[in-house]
Amino acid sequence: MIYSGTYTAIKADVPEFFMRKFIKLERIRANRESIQKKLNKKWLTCGIFTCVAAIAMIGSYRYISGIVKVSSNVNGKELPIYCVQTDEKKVALSFEAAWGNDDTQRILDILKEHNVHVTFFMTGGWVETYPDDVKAIYEAGHDLGNHSQNHKNMSQLSDEEKTQELMSVHEKVKELTGVKMQLFRPPYGDYDDAVVLNARENGYYPIQWDVDSLDWKDYGTDSILNTVLNHKALGNGSIILCHNGAKYTADALDALLDGLKEKGYQVVPISQLIYKENYHMDVTGRQIPDAK
């Protein structure tokens, strides 16, 4: 930029030729300053974009216990764990407990006979109604899982309501057993990105299933056995869905455990099947360990 006072003083003492040179140099300098300002602005914008991109990338990772890094984001979508990639012939059997307890003790007795431990996902209402059953499940060595307080469609709730649904039953189970649950299964298998992220932010691994026994349809014991044992998805790392309180589940359980054993599978709780750290997911919700 050329200041008028400077120009007047120079014009009085300097020949026209030099005056034109001076003005030209001043214009070049001013132009350089303008370009530099634009570049600085451009670099600032790029820097902000880079930071935002980095934050977005970090957003696709979740930290468990503030120590390890895991990825639950696949193609921009947050996924719960449907199954696990493993070379070991292990599967997890899970029971959802939301209504009734007529068959709870029978299920526990059959599991004990087979020396098998499983995972029970319990609603807050079920915990309140059957506290002795919760204690019996825990004392028998089974996983205690969170199935929400009121069995609502979690994707339709606000973040605050999601947290209340999780933490209300969390505190009830903790008070009864001392256990801080870490496994969460959304009611009806209903989830979206917000449900998965909310669960993780509250210290939970969101869990689905890849083998549905369809015991809730009440088709009979043979139907349950055929559905599970001949399911196309059944394999190493599968998570099997059953229900406490379904009409034929307890009747089918003994034969189901025998059938899984005959296929060479060891039944374990979900907590012993999933990876707690250093893993990522594929598009099917399969949990895959990171390469070492």
Locate the predicted segments by residue:
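Structural recognition of the beta-strand scaffold that forms the well-ordered cores
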Residues: 92-94, 118-122, 143-146, 182-186, ...
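Active-site beta->alpha N-cap acidic-glycine motif
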Residues: 66-157, 161-172, 181, 255, ...
